[in-house]
Structure formats: structure tokens, C-alpha cells
């Protein structure tokens, strides 16, 4: 079964919720703008904040570390990251958090590697981003490999407290 979602983290959590509710094994999870119709069965998943919160609470209850890993893993440039993260959650709920100590686990390793790459890029950009002033507003443009802006926001908000600064990703 292929699930199609809106591309948000809550939408991804709703995919996990629906796969458990419908007892379906997923072969792919695609953002709606990336989906190409195929002969395989597919279903569009609606984002429901209550369902997403239930899934996140369950993950946090099992392993707060995995919840953090999921949130950061979702920001990575890992191909098919949704499927890797889905399998990570399935394994967590099935086996418990014990497998998280085995860093060479085939479910865990690709996610850990991608998150390590994300964190390295965030660290690099904290020292690399330069702002230019234009009309009283500080602005910067970056071209990251991962979706780093949510992780950079708190650093630069604390550093530039003038309130009028902008950083955007080049498309």
C-alpha cells in the first residue's frame, strides 16, 4: 500500500496511525506533490492533529530518544526517509527500545547517519551564514542539503534580537 500525505510531520504521523488502524503494511509513503500514479494500491491520508498527537505521545512513552530522532530524521535529505522512519517506529512498537543500542541495526543505521549529516550541516551553517542589511532588515540566503531552518531558528533569534531578520533557502 502506498500512502500519500501533505508533506508535514503531522501528516507523516497520521500515515503511521492509519497503517496501524487499517493493519496495512506500507511499501511507500509519498508527499502529494511527489506522487506518480502507479498500478499499486494507494490512499490519500488526511492530516488529523489528534491522530498525530496520539502517535507522538506513544512514541515518546516508548522512547523519547526515538521521538527526537524522528523529528530530526524528518528534516533530512535521506531518500525515502518516510519509509525508513516508518520502519523505525514499527520496530520500536514491536520490539521496544532495546534495538536502539545497536547502532548497526539495518533499520536504525540509515536514520542515524542522515541525522548525523543534518546536525553537522546545522553546526556548519551556524558559523557560516552571513547576513546583509537592506533597508533595516537583515537577510541571508542559504542552499542547504537538508531542511535546516527549523533547527537554525532559535540560534539566530537569540543572536539577532532586533526582530527583523530573515533567512531563506534558495530553491
Where are the predicted features?
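N-terminal ordered "arm"
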Residues: 1-50
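Generic beta-sheet signal
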Residues: 1-3, 138, 165
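Short His-Asn-centered micro-motif
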Residues: 5-7, 140-145, 168
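Short, hydrophobic/amphipathic alpha-helical patches that form generic packing surfaces
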Residues: 11-22, 87-94, 154-158
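Charged, alpha-helical interface segments at or near domain boundaries
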Residues: 30-124
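Hydrophobic, aromatic-enriched interface-forming segments
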Residues: 106-161
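Residue-level detector of conserved catalytic or cofactor/ligand-binding positions
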Residues: 162-171
Amino acid at each position: 500500500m502506498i500512502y500519500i500525505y501533505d508533506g508535514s510531520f503531522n501528516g507523516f504521523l497520521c500515515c503511521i496511525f492509519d497503517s496501524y488502524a487499517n493493519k496495512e503494511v506500507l511499501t511507500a509513503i509519498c508527499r502529494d506533490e511527489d506522487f506518480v500514479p502507479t498500478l499499486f494500491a494507494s490512499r490519500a491520508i488526511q492530516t488529523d492533529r489528534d491522530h498525530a498527537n496520539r502517535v507522538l505521545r506513544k512514541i515518546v512513552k516508548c522512547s523519547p530518544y526515538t521521538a527526537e530522532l524522528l523529528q530530526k530524521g524528518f528534516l533530512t535529505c535521506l531518500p525515502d526517509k518516510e519509509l525508513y522512519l516508518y520502519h523505525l517506529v514499527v520496530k520500536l512498537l514491536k520490539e521496544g527500545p532495546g534495538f536502539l543500542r545497536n547502532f548497526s541495526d539495518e533499520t536504525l543505521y540509515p536514520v542515524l547517519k542522515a541525522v548525523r549529516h543534518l546536525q553537522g550541516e546545522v553546526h556548519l551553517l551556524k558559523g557560516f551564514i552571513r547576513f546583509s542589511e537592506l533597508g533595516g532588515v537583515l537577510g541571508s540566503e542559504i542552499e542547504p542539503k537538508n531542511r535546516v531552518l527549523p533547527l537554525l531558528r532559535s540560534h539566530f533569534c537569540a543572536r539577532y534580537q532586533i526582530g527583523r531578520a530573515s533567512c531563506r533557502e534558495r530553491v
